[in-house]
């Protein structure tokens, strides 16, 4: 069975690698071996294992001397350890005795400390009893001598002691409380009497007694009530004085001063009595006083505003303005109604009243916000009291009248400026432009000063309507006049008066576009400062965008008027351009040299432009004159391009075209502040093509080889221009790959 023997040999080989010599398992394994080869291998492994053991034994034996020496040292150390142990036991005994002694001492100390604490408490109680007795005697003595301040201090000190030692001196407490009640009665009686007599020093004396007596809240209420009475009395006197002046029919009734005095009294009452109010109830006392005095402001302030509205008959005036068909903001002529100068006076008065109310409200709200230790719910409550009560509603009524009056004032003055429009010496515009935008600027500034977003939006709407209707119509009027072009060149010569009228009308449009954008920018900046809320800014931005659209509308109107003017001038230039069609560009060297001396057409064209257009320069704004001149240049360039595309050129003719184009660019560049080179780009590129030596040279300038030059001619136009050269063959041009 060879296969079985091989398997046994393999198993023995595998098992021999895991034998651990010196163990019973190894001995059993050796006895089980049957293969000589396995036995031989195991024998060699056993011999190797024996050699490793011999080596380990030699190593251990080499350390014997060192180990013996260490063992001797350990034996000596054992003797020392016995001595150390004895010393340690002795020290442990000492520590234990010391610990026991410390425990005994600390216990005695704790007992002494407890006894001392009890003695101190007892002494404190004795001192308290003595001091309570002193307080009782002090109160009685102070009351007898009417030294109420000292009596209040004694009461306060007694109450503090009584709060600390609640279980002692009930008899003393009864005596003190009797004296306290007596002092409270005296303080209240004296305070009420002083309030009735408005004896301020006495009021201050007795209201200060309420805090040490623990009656802070009652004292605060009485003192703030006194302040309200004083303010009410002064406010009533001011109001009655105003009513008396009204009944006497006197025109100068100072409502602004009356309201100012009311606000001043309230603010001074808060500021000057801050210490008293804080002494009674801290910052809560200040907040309480502000809210209480605001009630007086609501009462007196709303009465003043209502009386002002009655005095100026604002309701009737507003009704007349709203109901009159001549006073609405639609295109129209002169209106009949209130005198705008009186209305402006009313507007200024209303603005003063509104500004006073806003300043007062902002001050008082900021005063409340500065109080850090008050109830967090007090701030929104107080703010609501300022924003939603009767005075605030009266301000809203006045604001509505302001918007109506401001709108009327704006409409009347803008229409008046349009009606009395006249030429201003040494000015390029008529009086209407500056006058109208001054009125709009003034009215919008006033509206912003109200800090009322609705007022600003309404006045902005008025301004936009006026500019889009009345003012727009006034700007168009001159341009729409019939036969304006015919009158511009009567007898073949530019008529200065007509030119001035046309130029001024166009200048009005140009300057108006600029003024609208300036006004828009100014209003936007001011509103950004006054109205920080994002929602308010969005509303204003929406209204201002309409002003921007009006500027674009005026710009379109200006362009239309400018085109009409150019259409009047260009027929006088066209004859010179028509002569260019008769001039040959198939030049010989002699003809080219002759043209250099005697220009065939460029100078005549420039002279025609100077004669028919340049005389308008001093009459126009620089922007308008540049636009006017550029429109003429556009006309000239387009006509020249058409003419040149119909000609035939020699190479010298191409040079002549380049020279002519350069002369035009140079001259026109001196006439205008804007660049004109781009307008002649196509002609310049035509001249470049016509100057080439051969057709293929165009590839040096085309496509990737064009460099910084941008081609204005299409590939088809380039082929057409190449075809204008008499020397170039059509088949060469057709072969070009552009």
UniProtKB/Swiss-Prot annotation:
Protein name per its UniProtKB record: Conserved oligomeric Golgi complex subunit 4
Membrane topology according to the record: Peripheral membrane protein
Gene Ontology biological process: protein transport
Any one of the GO CC terms: Golgi membrane
Coiled coil segments of this chain: none
Taxonomic source organism: Arabidopsis thaliana (Mouse-ear cress)
Gene for this chain: COG4
Subunit record text: Component of the conserved oligomeric Golgi complex which is composed of eight different subunits and is required for normal Golgi morphology and localization. Interacts with COG2 and COG3.
Principal location listed in the UniProt entry: Golgi
Sorted UniProt keywords: Golgi apparatus, Membrane, Protein transport, Transport
């Amino acid at each position: 069975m060879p296969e079985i023997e091989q398997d046994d040999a393999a198993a023995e080989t595998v098992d021999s690698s895991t034998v651990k010599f010196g163990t019973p398992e190894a001995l059993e394994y050796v006895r089980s071996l049957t293969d000589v080869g396995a036995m031989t291998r195991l024998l060699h492994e056993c011999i190797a294992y024996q050699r490793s053991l011999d080596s380990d034994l030699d190593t251990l034996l080499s350390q014997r001397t060192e180990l013996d020496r260490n063992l001797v040292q350990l034996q000596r150390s054992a003797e020392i350890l016995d001595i150390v142990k004895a010393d340690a036991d002795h020290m442990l005994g000492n520590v234990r005795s010391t610990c026991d002694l410390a425990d005994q001492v600390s216990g005695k100390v704790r007992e002494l400390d407890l006894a001392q604490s009890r003695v101190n408490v007892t002494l404190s109680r004795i001192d308290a009893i003595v001091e309570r007795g002193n307080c009782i005697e002090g109160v009685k003595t102070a009351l007898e001598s009417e030294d109420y301040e000292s009596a209040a201090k004694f009461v306060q000190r007694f109450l503090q002691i009584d709060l600390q030692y609640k279980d002692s001196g009930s008899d003393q407490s009864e005596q003190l409380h009797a004296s306290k009640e007596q002092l409270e009665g005296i303080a209240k009686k004296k305070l009420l009497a002083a309030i009735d007599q408005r004896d301020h020093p006495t009021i201050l004396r007795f209201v200060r007694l309420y805090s040490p007596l623990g009656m802070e809240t009652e004292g605060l209420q009485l003192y703030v009530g006194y302040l309200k009475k004083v303010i009410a009395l002064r406010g009533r006197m001011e109001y009655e004085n105003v009513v008396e002046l009204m009944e006497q029919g006197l025109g100068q009734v100072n409502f602004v001063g009356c309201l100012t005095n009311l606000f001043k009294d309230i603010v001074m009452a808060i500021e000057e009595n801050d210490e008293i109010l804080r002494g009674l109830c801290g910052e809560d006392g200040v907040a309480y006083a502000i809210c209480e005095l605001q009630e007086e402001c609501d009462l007196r302030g709303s009465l003043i505003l209502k009386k002002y509205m009655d005095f100026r008959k604002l309701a009737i005036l507003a009704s007349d303005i709203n109901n009159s068909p001549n006073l609405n903001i639609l295109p129209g002529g002169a209106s009949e109604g209130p005198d705008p100068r009186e209305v402006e006076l009313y507007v200024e008065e209303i603005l003063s009243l509104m500004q006073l109310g806003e300043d007062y409200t902002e001050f008082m709200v900021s005063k409340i916000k500065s109080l850090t230790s008050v109830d967090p719910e007090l701030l929104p409550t107080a703010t609501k009291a300022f924003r939603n009560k009767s005075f605030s509603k009266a301000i809203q009524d006045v604001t509505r009248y302001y918007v109506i009056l401001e709108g009327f004032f704006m409409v009347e003055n803008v229409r008046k400026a349009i009606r009395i429009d006249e030429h201003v010496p040494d000015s390029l515009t008529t009086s209407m432009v500056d006058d109208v935008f001054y009125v709009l600027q003034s009215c919008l500034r006033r509206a912003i000063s109200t800090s009322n977003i609705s007022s600003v939006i309404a006045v902005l709407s008025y301004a936009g309507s006026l500019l889009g209707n009345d003012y727009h119509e006034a700007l168009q009027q001159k341009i729409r006049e019939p036969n304006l072009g015919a009158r511009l060149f009567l007898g073949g010569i530019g008529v200065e008066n007509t030119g001035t009228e046309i130029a001024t009308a166009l200048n009005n449009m140009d300057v108006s576009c600029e003024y609208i954008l300036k006004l828009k920018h100014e209003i936007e900046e001011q509103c950004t400062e006054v109205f920080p809320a994002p929602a308010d800014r969005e509303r204003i931005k929406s209204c201002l965008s309409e002003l921007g659209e009006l500027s674009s509308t005026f710009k379109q109107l200006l362009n239309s008027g400018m085109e009409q003017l150019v259409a009047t001038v260009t027929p006088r230039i066209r004859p010179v351009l028509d002569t260019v069609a008769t001039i040959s560009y198939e030049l010989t060297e002699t003809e080219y040299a002759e043209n250099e001396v005697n220009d065939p057409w460029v100078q005549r064209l420039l002279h025609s432009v100077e004669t028919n257009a340049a005389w308008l320069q001093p009459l126009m704004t620089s922007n308008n004159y540049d636009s006017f001149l550029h429109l003429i240049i556009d006309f000239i360039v387009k006509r020249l391009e058409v003419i040149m595309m119909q000609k035939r050129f020699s190479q010298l003719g191409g040079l002549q075209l380049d020279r002519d184009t350069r002369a035009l660019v140079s001259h026109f560049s001196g006439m205008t502040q804007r660049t004109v080179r781009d307008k002649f780009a196509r002609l310049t590129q035509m001249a470049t093509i016509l100057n080439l030596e051969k057709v293929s040279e165009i590839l040096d300038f085309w496509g990737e080889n064009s460099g910084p030059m941008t081609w204005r001619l299409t590939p088809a136009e380039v082929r057409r221009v190449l075809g204008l050269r008499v020397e170039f063959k059509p088949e060469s041009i057709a072969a070009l790959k552009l």
